[in-house]
Design a protein with these regions (language model features):
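Short, compositionally stereotyped local motifs that mark structural "simplifiers"
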Residues: 1-98, 103-119
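Short, flexible loop/turn elements at secondary-structure junctions
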Residues: 12, 85-87, 105, 127-129, ...
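Long, contiguous hydrophobic alpha-helical segments, chiefly transmembrane helices and signal peptides
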Residues: 47, 81, 101, 125, ...
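Generic detection of long, well-ordered alpha-helical segments
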Residues: 91-94, 132, 173-177
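A broadly structural signal marking compact, well-ordered functional cores
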Residues: 105, 110-113, 134, 138-145
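Solvent-exposed edge beta-strands and adjacent loop segments
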Residues: 114-133
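Short, conserved helix/loop micro-motifs enriched in His/Cys and acidic residues
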Residues: 136-181
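Conserved small/polar residues in nucleotide/adenosyl-binding loops
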Residues: 183-185
Length: 185
């Protein structure tokens, strides 16, 4: 990705565009957009248009994932899920933390990061499981979020539409996944 310029536009000639880079909602005191924003690392940009009459547009978010050099050329025959918390540290066990998820599916039999993600959206993520939460392979609960951190339904990997999902890390129990029907589909 390198140094990628990102441009924000508005159809209104009198509008002031304000944006944030920390995931917060842009407000009247947020950074004023004056020209292309340079993206040099994984970033989330949230922007709103402020009109002189006091009206404010809905928030629009864009997320950019900077992959480590050792995985940029990775490919696989199965779908790949990438989650980035933008430097947020470890995934919490209590409240959902904002993150971004992209799902890549095979094209021509191979999944590659040069393919466009089939799903790319804001999420809330947390670890789950009281007795299993400290194990080497944890499970995660996640919710697909809209611009207001409200649940929104998606259908990842051809599954039914839903907002709440589990990334199940079966580690100590049923390591062979014999009781996990998804593995046998």
């Amino acid at each position: 990705m390198g140094n990628t310029p990102m441009t924000i536009t508005s159809e209104s000639p009198t509008a002031v565009i304000r944006y944030t880079r920390d995931g917060s909602l842009p407000g009247a005191n947020s950074t004023r957009y004056t020209g292309p924003v340079t993206i040099t690392s994984s970033s989330r940009i949230r922007a709103r248009v402020f009109e002189p009459d006091g009206s404010v547009s809905p928030t629009v978010s864009r997320s950019y994932i900077m992959l480590a050099s050792n995985v940029r050329n990775f490919s696989s025959t199965i779908p790949v899920v990438v989650i980035d918390s933008f430097g947020g540290g470890g995934v919490p066990s209590g409240s959902f933390e904002e993150a971004f998820m992209a799902i890549y599916e095979p094209v021509g039999g191979r999944t590659s990061f040069s393919n466009e993600a089939v799903l790319a959206n804001r999420i809330g993520i947390k670890t789950r499981g009281s007795s299993t939460g400290g194990r080497d392979k944890v499970s995660y609960g996640l919710e697909f979020w809209d611009e207001n951190n409200e649940d929104t339904d998606f259908s990842p990997l051809g599954m039914p539409e839903e907002s709440d999902w589990i990334l199940y890390g079966a580690y100590n129990f049923d390591r062979a996944h014999l009781r996990l029907s998804l593995i046998h589909i």
